[in-house]
Amino acid sequence: MAEITKADVISFIENMTVLELAELVKELEDKFGVSAAAPVAVAAAAAPAAAAEAAEEKTEFDVILKSAGANKIGVIKVVRALTGLGLKEAKDLVDGAPKPVKNGVSKEEAEEAKKQLVESGAEVEIK
């Protein structure tokens, strides 16, 4: 059996879609009993409990597509680019609005996604 190198693993991960990466992270978290957010929790542990909860709530945002507007095709293209979904899945998401496009992302990533969606004609909300 050929030995797999770190470079092989990195190359494989580079070619994965966003959804595949999310599934991989979840499987690794389950297998090893860890959380990808652990470094944030360690830093927050030094602060008082109430402050830690408030900080944690404000670090993750959801981008909600409220409606596609008049340029539905443009919105589908942006949704595909942001999520890595296939054409049918992206169309179903846009048709089923209001639906979340991205969950648990940083404020910067949420604002960038909202900007792209609004520029394509969509009505978007960040929660």
UniProtKB/Swiss-Prot annotation:
Bias-annotated ranges (Basic and acidic residues): 105-117
CDD domains per record: Ribosomal_L7_L12
One record GO biological process: translation
Gene3D superfamilies, per database record: 3.30.1390.10, Single helix bin
Endpoints of the signal sequence: none
GO CC annotations on file: cytosolic large ribosomal subunit
Residues covered by region (Disordered): 98-127
One MF term in the entry's GO annotations: mRNA binding
Alphabetized UniProt keyword annotations: Ribonucleoprotein, Ribosomal protein
Xref: InterPro entries: Ribosomal_bL12, Ribosomal_bL12_C, Ribosomal_bL12_C/ClpS-like, Ribosomal_bL12_oligo, Ribosomal_bL12_oligo_N_sf
Protein origin, superkingdom: Bacteria
Pfam families named in the record: Ribosomal_L12 (PF00542), Ribosomal_L12_N (PF16320)
Physiological role: Forms part of the ribosomal stalk which helps the ribosome interact with GTP-bound translation factors. Is thus essential for accurate translation.
Self-association and partners: Homodimer. Part of the ribosomal stalk of the 50S ribosomal subunit. Forms a multimeric L10(L12)X complex, where L10 forms an elongated spine to which 2 to 4 L12 dimers bind in a sequential fashion. Binds GTP-bound translation factors.
NCBIfam families assigned: L12
Family: Belongs to the bacterial ribosomal protein bL12 family.
Protein name: Large ribosomal subunit protein bL12
Record organism: Geobacter sulfurreducens (strain ATCC 51573 / DSM 12127 / PCA)
